[in-house]
Amino acid sequence: MKSFLLIALVLFFLFVSYASAKKKCQLPSDVGKGKASFTRYYYNEESGKCETFIYGGVGGNSNNFLTKEDCCRECAQGSC
């Protein structure tokens, strides 16, 4: 019985993590409020690809990745 509860708990946390990652990928790119000019990557749901945008350095949202590889790993399904 304890093994079943442990497995159920692990599956629940995996599902919650997956769902929150997908919500992140549905957000639009957000330059933030800063005045910096950093090249970052976001997942574009319309194109199904990770694309670049200029990030201001402050604020924004969680659809903001340092590398294309990070963006693809979290958001892209299939090739990126």
Curated annotation (Swiss-Prot):
Record keywords: Disulfide bond, Protease inhibitor, Secreted, Serine protease inhibitor, Signal
Record-linked SUPFAM superfamilies: BPTI-like (SSF57362)
SMART domains from the UniProt entry: KU
Residues of the signal peptide: 1-21
Keyword match Secreted: yes
An annotated GO BP: envenomation resulting in negative regulation of voltage-gated potassium channel activity in another organism
Domain BPTI/Kunitz inhibitor: 25-75
Subcellular location: Secreted
GO molecular function: potassium channel regulator activity; serine-type endopeptidase inhibitor activity; toxin activity
Tissues in which the protein is found: Expressed by the venom gland.
Any one annotated GO CC term: extracellular space
Post-translational modifications: Lacks the conserved CysII-CysIV disulfide bond but contains 2 cysteine residues at the C-terminus that generate a new disulfide bond.
General function of this protein: Serine protease inhibitor that inhibits trypsin at a molar ratio of 1:1 (Ki=140 nM).
Anything else known: Negative results: has no effect on chymotrypsin and elastase. Shows weak inhibitory activity against mKv1.3/KCNA3 potassium channels (inhibits 50% of currents at 1 uM) (IC(50)=1.58 uM), Kv1.1/KCNA1 (inhibits 25% of currents at 1 uM), and Kv1.2/KCNA2 (1 uM inhibits 25% of currents).
Family designation: Belongs to the venom Kunitz-type family. Scorpion delta-Ktx subfamily. Delta-Ktx 2 sub-subfamily.
Name by which UniProt lists this protein: Kunitz-type serine protease inhibitor LmKTT-1a
Organism (species): Lychas mucronatus (Chinese swimming scorpion)
